[in-house]
Amino acid sequence: MHFISSAMASFCLETTVEDAMQTVRDAGFDSLDFPLSVYSRPQDAPLRGDDWRQWARGVRRTADRIGLPITQAHASWEQAIPDDLHYESPYEIYERTMEACAILGCRQLIFHPVLYLHRMPDRSLWPRIHDWNVRWFHELLPLAEKFDIVINLENTFDYRHLQQPGDAPVPYTTAQDMLELVYGIGSNRVQLCLDTGHAHISGQDVPEMIRAWRGNLATLHLNDNYGLIRPVFEDLHLFPGYGTLE
């Protein structure tokens, strides 16, 4: 079964969780991409509190009552690879996020690869960044099994404008990088999420990415933008056809 869902991350904090979900339902969507990432920060966010499980159960009851199943959710992306590339295990908030995803009745949890937030003119650091990510996601696999969740790895982009013209692509912006991460982790609990907007900003061929990923593609974030238009933030999440994605 395929669902057409909508995200609500851009407006959910301007109202209650229930009203934000009802807005998505009233717009005609049959499912929801729930922003656990938004509700996990800052420090007083619902997922940080002592009653976070109760909060998640309340969200699930709302989804059931209004008839809006949560078919995917987005994990936090607050962790980055340290400057000296020493390894750090996943923060505790990721375990909460994965359990909350299960409470919501959702199996597809979207993760960004963990990024190294420095300019990388060439690919010399790629092996260390790749090994770091493989190890990090390996640590999450027991939780994915415990909560019956599929980790969906989403292609990213140079959102901090660190790269300069002529530099190598940012890791995990290309189809091949993402496939190597999936194969490196080596688990049926890991698949791919294609964000068409991120791909467009990164100058990637979206249809070719779909063909390359084949059965590894589990979720699609279909959105548009104007491509790389630095120095502004390009990830506009426009409705398809309102940007320059072909």
Language-model-derived ranges and their functions:
Residues M1-E14, R25-D26:
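N-terminal basic, low-complexity leaders that serve as flexible interaction/assembly modules and, when applicable
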Residues H2-M8, L32-F34, I70-A75, L109-F111, ...:
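Hydrophobic faces of well-ordered beta-strands that scaffold small-molecule active sites
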Residues A7-F11, P35-Y39, A75-E78, V114-Y116, ...:
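Active-site beta-loop-alpha junctions enriched in small/polar residues
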Residues L13-E14, M21, Q43, D50, ...:
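Gly/Pro-rich active-site loop or hairpin
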Residues V17-Y39, A100-Q108:
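Catalytic domains of carbohydrate-active enzymes, especially glycoside hydrolases
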Residues A27-D30, L68, L104, N188, ...:
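Structured loop/turn residues at beta-strand edges in well-structured enzyme cores
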Residues D33-R60, R119:
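Glycine-rich, proline-tolerant flexible connector loops at the mouths of alpha/beta enzymes
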Residues R57, T62-I66, I81-Q191, I201:
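Active-site acidic/histidine proton-transfer and metal-coordination neighborhood
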